[in-house]
């Protein structure tokens, strides 16, 4: 399937937003000054963050407070093959969480920060669950994890109901 995504806006590209709200930067349409890229040692090629190394790089770059500009146009597209979607989603979730743990280790240990961290992990699980709705059992496990981590992410609840409803309809058709 093909999906069009508009990245940005620029006010979402600062370090705290990238950390607590997620990635809003596309690798395929990004230009970075060589010296800036070198100053943060480029991509981290650690195996635990493969598929999310760009997200890690954006956060390390954002920590330097560079000038960031977004072009308000769709500049590329990507294709997801359904036969590999599940393993890719779960691998990306694992990598995203590894990046988050890496950057959270540098944050304060205040109660508010820990709550925000739990919320961010919940959003990661929620996002993966939304991508796995064709596999209701796996999606429900991720939605449940998301609710356990941060029960006040209210958008989870309608997503769970829709998943259950659609699963019941699919079952009746069989």
Describe every region a protein language model picked out.
Residues 2-91:
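Conserved nucleotide-sugar donor-binding catalytic segment
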Residues 68, 74-174:
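C-terminal subregions of glycosyltransferases and related glycan-biosynthesis enzymes
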């Amino acid at each position: 399937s093909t999906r069009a995504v508009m990245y940005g806006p620029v006010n979402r590209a600062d370090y705290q937003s990238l950390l607590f709200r997620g990635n809003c930067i596309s690798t395929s349409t990004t230009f970075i000054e060589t010296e800036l890229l070198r100053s943060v040692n480029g991509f981290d090629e650690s195996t635990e963050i493969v598929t999310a190394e760009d997200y890690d790089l954006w956060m390390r770059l954002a920590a330097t407070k560079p000038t960031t500009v977004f072009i308000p146009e769709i500049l590329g597209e990507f294709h997801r093959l359904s036969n590999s979607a599940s393993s890719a989603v779960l691998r990306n979730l694992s990598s995203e969480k590894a990046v988050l743990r890496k950057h959270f280790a540098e944050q304060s240990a205040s109660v508010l920060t820990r709550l925000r961290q739990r919320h961010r992990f919940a959003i990661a699980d929620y996002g993966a669950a939304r991508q796995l709705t064709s596999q209701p059992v796996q999606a429900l496990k991720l939605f449940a994890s998301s609710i356990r981590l941060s029960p006040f992410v209210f958008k989870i609840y309608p997503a769970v109901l829709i998943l259950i409803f659609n699963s019941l309809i699919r079952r009746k058709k069989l």
